[in-house]
Amino acid sequence: MGQRVIAPELQALYDKGAQVYSYSKLGTIHDCPYNAYLTYIEKREQCANVYSSLGTVVHDTLEGIIEGKNTEADIGPAIENGLDELDMLGIDFPKTRDGGNGIRDKWISNMRCMARDWVSPKGEYEVEKLLILKLRDDRYLQGYADLIRVLPDGRLQVLDIKTSSQFKDEDLLHYGRQLVAYTLALEQAGFKTAVPCWIMVKYCKITYETGFGKRAKPSEKVLDRCKVGYTLRSIVRSKMKAAGYDSEQIEIVT
């Protein structure tokens, strides 16, 4: 993403002397004051890392599909080009405890599966929308929502594209505040809203039945994309065994 031009709405607030807080800046100050000092006081140039660099590549390509600038066929080449650039710069993924490349291999496997199978969300969207939440007459919070989905009933839903790992339950409140703040900004502007969501591109949800006959009931699992095939195979093999198929038949089918 390039440097953003100051939006007229923000300039109007600056001109009247209002204090405008950036959500991302506040997050940096809260999470690591030393990082905030180096970034905003010392103005140090930040070092690139694999997650921010590749996350931006995926993020921009998926948004480009929604805007009509890209297609699903562009995802794979964009990821491969991003990996090649990092290799040339000598920037690598963290190593596992034994010094291996398991973290890199898993991330790449998930992203390649995503690139192969991705179906872009359909409907009406706004991309990288500036949202401003009024805290009081002289204080405001501003940020940019990845996507705002316009639902058929007219409500707006804030969506955030994530290439990171799933959040732990105890971290949901911390990371969810940003989406809540953006949703409040929409409501403050007079819009009706729906519950905000993350789009976690490394994962997908599969639905399947467990049990047989009257005992059958739907079950759901959220899995790494690269594990879906193995998981479904395991489920099918288990159900075939329970249904009386012998091991040779199961092996042939699965």
Give the ranges of each region predicted by the language model.
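Charged, compositionally biased N-terminal leader segments and the immediate start
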Residues: 4-18
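A non-catalytic, helix-rich entry segment at domain boundaries
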Residues: 57, 61-130, 134-135
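Residue-level signal for well-ordered alpha-helical scaffold segments within enzymatic catalytic domains
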Residues: 39-40, 60, 64, 113, ...
